[in-house]
Structures are given as structure tokens and as C-alpha cells.
Amino acid sequence: MDKARIDQIIDKHNADPSSLIQVMLEIQGEKHWLPKYVLEQVSERLQVPLTRIQHIATFYKAFSLVPKGRHEINVCVGTACHVRGASRILDTLTELTGIKAGETDLELKYSLETVNCVGCCALGPVMEIDGKIFGNVTPTETIDLLKNYK
């Protein structure tokens, strides 16, 4: 992401310091992570101390300071999903992608995370890919679903 695009996003929010989180979310949505040069530019343009921006970026799980994959996969490991086989879904994803929960593959294709609950307990086990929820997922369905996210 070039500096001009970052400026466009900031300008869209009128360079208003109160829009900091929205600006960060929009950049994160396009870049999939927040490199230091991005944080520095946002700090300068919004007149918000870099330390405050770094605090926000490390406090909220929505933000990442390390590169993430193009496809973000979340597997619910809450109680309902756990008892319905979430660990088998995680094992299948690890086998298919070569990464464990909390990791991103070297090609920056996939990032795999666990979440405590996505609020769809009746549909467990639940997997989310790029914000789309899939319920009652089996290991076989996991294989088929992942084929759609190359």
C-alpha cells in the first residue's frame, strides 16, 4: 500500500483524530496488517502520538502488526463447538495449510486463528473464512470449502 492510498483513506475521514480506529480498520482491511510506516503516516496526518496508535493496534485483536494471509480463517473453540468437533476442523486445516492456530503460511495465503465464540453455538462446529460463517462443518466439508479460497 503506497502513501497516496493511505492519504486517501485518511482524507475520506477528514483527517479527524476521532476516526483513528476507522482509519486503521480500513487500512487493515486492504493491507491485512499494519506496517510501521503506515502507523507513522497515520500518526503524522491525524496528529495522534505513535505510542497511542501502537497501543490501540496491540490492544484489539482485529489489528495485526505482522503480515497476515489473504484469507483469514477462524475456528470457534467455544464450548458448543469444542464438544461438536472443532479440534477435528483445526487438525484438518493444519494438515491442508501447513500452519497451526496463530500462524500465517509463508506465501501469505492463509492465516489461521481460534476464537472463543462467534455467537452461532447451534451451528457448531463453526468456521469463518474472510468473514463468512460456515456451520456444522465436517473435516470433509472443510477440505471442499478451502478449495474455494486459493
Which sequence ranges carry the predicted segments?
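Signature of N-terminal electron-transfer/Fe-S-associated modules in redox systems
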Residues: 1-150
